[in-house]
Curated annotation (Swiss-Prot):
E.C. numbers: 6.1.1.20
Family: Belongs to the class-II aminoacyl-tRNA synthetase family. Phe-tRNA synthetase alpha subunit type 1 subfamily.
A GO term for molecular function: tRNA binding
One biological process term in Gene Ontology: phenylalanyl-tRNA aminoacylation
Disulphide-bonded residues: none
SUPFAM superfamilies: Class II aaRS and biotin synthetases, tRNA-binding arm
PANTHER family: PHENYLALANINE--TRNA LIGASE, MITOCHONDRIAL, PHENYLALANYL-TRNA SYNTHETASE
Quaternary structure, from the entry: Tetramer of two alpha and two beta subunits.
Keywords: Aminoacyl-tRNA synthetase, ATP-binding, Cytoplasm, Ligase, Magnesium, Metal-binding, Nucleotide-binding, Protein biosynthesis
Protein name in UniProt: Phenylalanine--tRNA ligase alpha subunit
Species of origin: Thermotoga maritima (strain ATCC 43589 / DSM 3109 / JCM 10099 / NBRC 100826 / MSB8)
Amino acid sequence: MEIEAVEKEAIEKLSKISNVQELESFRIEFLGKKGKITGLMKNLKNLPPEERPAYGKRVNELREKIEKLFEEKRQQIQRILEQEKMEKMRIDVTVPGARRKLGHSHPVLKVMEEIERIFVSMGFDVVEGPEIETTWHNFDALNTPEWHPARDEHDSFYITDDLLLRTHTSPVQIRTMLERKPPIAIISPGKVYRRDYDATHLPMFHQVEGLHVDRDLSVAHLKFTLEEFARRMFGEGAKVRLRPSFFPFTEPSFEVDVYLSGYGWLEILGAGMVDPNVFLNVGYDPEEWTGYAFGMGVERIAMLKYGIADIREFVRNDVRFLSSY
């Protein structure tokens, strides 16, 4: 009979199937809407009425049988695929693991943290302040007159007439003196901004500025502090000298050089005794209190410490350069 022929063909083909694509082709050929088993049901109209029930029953039994065999084959193929996937995912624990490249601190950050540790060990507090400053905190309170070139738009990043990106961290000293009574000893690390960009200048760089206010402080205290810093930062052989200079907020003012073996004398920072006008601006009595201040560019210190010639290397994000320090 035709039913037995379809059954034999289906079972034979199903036994040879080995992948999902062949299984889908089988389903369409035998179990689909236009498949061979569905086609058997179309023969009902050609049979005598009394034979139709038995014939229909036989066709339905065949469909159920083939569907069961089909599902078993599908599960068998699925198990094989899962096993193959597991084999591919198998981990050989004897194979050496891949070495991860660990990140580390940027050389500028490393130097800034070292500067902080040195001054904290000498009794200074670390104080921070806003990077957007008023012109009063950034210039006026620091005895910087309106005609001073540092206040020009060509040198500073103004946001409004009264607000700008701070050009140094000295405003933190002003804010601290307004909030605290002397004596105080602080350093203020952070980002500062100036319109300058070349091999030795960046428009955004880092500074650490220091302030010590107490009774009877002198240039001798300032020099001792800077000598101790240089010795700890650059080694026991480092020497310090002070050259006369001018800053609006200190009087007297000095450029500070450090002597490094193999390099000679190199300028590293500016310093001086706090100008009495600055004390008056924050409500300190200059007849009672004296103080010294200093400020250094962290990138400058890092360049000297690591022998880096171009300051722009710090912001080029070259992993080969950064991983060397």
